[in-house]
UniProtKB/Swiss-Prot annotation:
Residues 1-8, 64-66, 82-87, 173-180, 258-279 are cytoplasmic. It catalyses: glycerol(in) = glycerol(out). Residues 38-42, 112-146, 198-201, 220-234 are periplasmic. This is Glycerol uptake facilitator protein. The gene is glpF. It comes from Pseudomonas aeruginosa (strain ATCC 15692 / DSM 22644 / CIP 104116 / JCM 14847 / LMG 12228 / 1C / PRS 101 / PAO1).
Amino acid sequence: MTTAAPTPSLFGQCLAEFLGTALLIFFGTGCVAALKVAGASFGLWEISIIWGVGVSMAIYLSAGVSGAHLNPAVSIALWLFAGFEGRKLPFYITAQVAGAFCAAALVYTLYSSLFIEFEQAQNIVRGSQDSLALASVFSTYPHPALSVGQAFLVEVVITAILMAVIMALTDDGNGLPRGPLAPLLIGLLIAVIGSAMGPLTGFAMNPARDFGPKLMTYLAGWGPIAFTGGREIPYFLVPIFAPILGACLGAGGYRVLIARHLPSAAAPAEAEPEKVRAS
C-alpha cells in the first residue's frame, strides 16, 4: 500500500514563495539594470522575454512546494475562487513581498557602483523627479502621458487577462492537460503582455513585485518619490490594488464564462440520472 506524500509545512511553503518571488525579481530587475546603467542593448521584446522566463523558472522552482503563487493578487484570487486556505494568505503575501525586497536589494548591491557612476555622469540627484528613471529599474511607474486612473485601468485589464489564462492553463478539464508546459506558457503570456502593454505602466500585475522593490528604493536614498512617483495621488497604490481587482475579475470571469461551460463541468450532473436508472 502506498502512502500519500506529506503536505509541506507552512514554513516550507512560505520559503518557496520567498525564493520563487526573489528569483523572478532578480532576473527581471537585473535585466533592466543592465539596460539602464551598464550599456546593454535590450529591446522591449527582449526585456519582456527575460521577465517571462524568470517567472517560468520561479514557478518550476517553487510549484511543488507552495503552488508557485509568487503574487499576492494571485493568492487572493485563488482564495476567493479556487479554495486556497485563507489562513495562509498573510504568510504567503509576507513571504512574496520579502522575496521581492531582498532580490531588489541584491541587484542594487551588485550594480551599486554603476548606479553611482551613472548618477554622477548625468548629474542626477537621488530623490528628484529625474531619479525616477533609475528607480524604475526596480519597480513600475506609468508613462508620463497617462493619468493615475488610466494606469489603474491598464493594470486591472492586464492582470485580469493574466489570471484568467493562469486558471485555464492549470485547469485539466479545459482541453489537454498542460502539466510541465504550464510554467513556460505562463512565462510566454507575461512576455506577450509586457510587449503589448509594458510601455504604459511597466506591467506590474503583482503587488509584491512592485511594493517590495519600491520599499528598497525608498530606503536606498530615493525617499518619498519612490512611492509617489511624482504624482499627487501616490502611485504605489495602483500596482497594489489594481492587480488584486484584476486578478479577482480574471478568476471570477473564468469560472463564470469558461469553466461552467466545459464538458467536464457538466459530466457529474449528467451522470447522476444514469445512477438512478441503474438502481
